[in-house]
Amino acid sequence: MKLSARIAAPAAALVLAGLTATACAPGTSDTGAEGDAKTGTLRVWLFQEVGNKPKEKVVDAAVADFEKAHEGAEVEVEYIPVDTRAQRVKAAFNDPKSAPDLIEYGNTDTAGYVKDGGLADVSEEFAAWDEAKDTDPTAKQSVTVDGQVYGAPLFVGVRALYYRTDVFEDLGIEPPKSQDELISTAKKIRREKPDLYGLAVGGAYTYGAMPFIWAQGGELADETGVTYRSAINSAKARKGIEAYTSLFGDDNCPAAKCAAMGGNATVTAFASGKAAMAIGGDFSHAAVEAGAVKGRYAVVPLPGVTAGSIAPAFAGGNNIGVLKSSSHRTLAVDLMKSLTGKETQAKMFDAMGFLPTYTDVLGTAAEKEPFVGPFVETLGAGAKFVPASPAWGQIDASLVLPTMFQEIASGRKDVDAASDDAAKKMDAAFAEAG
């Protein structure tokens, strides 16, 4: 294996919520490939992580096995910053000669990259791949657009409820078992311990708010056959919005401080001992372990509306896809399988803590590391995904939902007005995307 000399500098940690920034990128051209060479150099772009060495070791092992099994093939890996990936990928779609053969991409980018014509349809190969039959359905959904498969899932990430065991023990309370109980527990803690946020929430924490909407039976958007129509202002969605925004106030998390917070800020508040609860991902575990609350917290699934139920979580994560422009399609698909197969995902979990996308490998991971249990349980209860539309990148990048939450939290608009405005913006994006 050859490691590219253009190793990217470390970037900010990847947020599994899917960071999309495709709106201002240039248009794409025809990216169809010519030929299918069975030897030569395959180029791969993977994301640079904070603390990337463990990931590199896992990738190196997978590549070595691939090269051993494919005489005459070499692999060159380049690690690129997450925050500039949109520009790099768009440029690659426009210039096939300089493009890699495979890329790692966030699962909320799938539909946009498919619309741009950059990703190869690997439906046939995926269906014939024996390991793929054990792929978690939600993970498979993240590589599927209009029934066709455009890559293989690499890892999945979901969120659950982190809580301070010492605070709960001191107050004689149990972890909340319903959404109403979550809200009342948060406010009780704030009342009894005013130096703490009961539940750290953020107006810019889109993927922490979504479970409240989904738990009430609401949806972000409804598929209408050829496109989507916003459902964020439906009666059920508004119940979820109202529940989430009720947590912004002096009786839990003051809007003046919390309205601007995103997911990282809420987890940081918890890890530093400023909050009794937070909605964090399996990928937040290392940060919490490194914080002031180490040894004084536990994790349970975020409760749903009915006591004992689990609120649907957003299934974030990353995939590996073959570019349509690759002149080594057969080799590239085989390398995709090597980089996302069960053996590699098991090693990646051990090295990086990324949750495997295979149900059997995920079960083994949960047995090995108990902290994974609540996240596996959350996945098993039925995680959800964003609309499979290229418009989602624009909706996410233009902060449509954070603006809605912040307007409500600040008192500038009520739930009805703010959700109506958000729905109009979403529908405009869906219409533009076609």
Model-flagged regions — what are they?
Residues 2-112, 306, 330-331, 417, ...:
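Conserved N-terminal structural module of periplasmic/extracytoplasmic solute-binding proteins
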Residues 68, 171, 246-252, 289-354:
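Extracytoplasmic/periplasmic substrate-recognition and gating elements
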Residues 107-158, 212, 298, 367-370, ...:
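Hinge/lid segment of periplasmic solute-binding proteins
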Residues 114-118, 138-174, 201-226, 315-321, ...:
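Periplasmic solute-binding protein
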Residues 123-135, 199, 218-239, 289-292, ...:
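Short, solvent-exposed loop/beta-turn-alpha elements that line the ligand-binding surface or hinge
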Residues 169-170, 381-434:
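Conserved C-terminal helix/tail region of periplasmic/extracytoplasmic solute-binding proteins
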Residues 186, 229-257:
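Glycine-centered hinge/linker elements that transmit conformational signals in sensory
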Residues 300, 350-397, 407, 431:
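Long, aromatic- and glycine/proline-rich binding clefts that accommodate carbohydrate-like moieties
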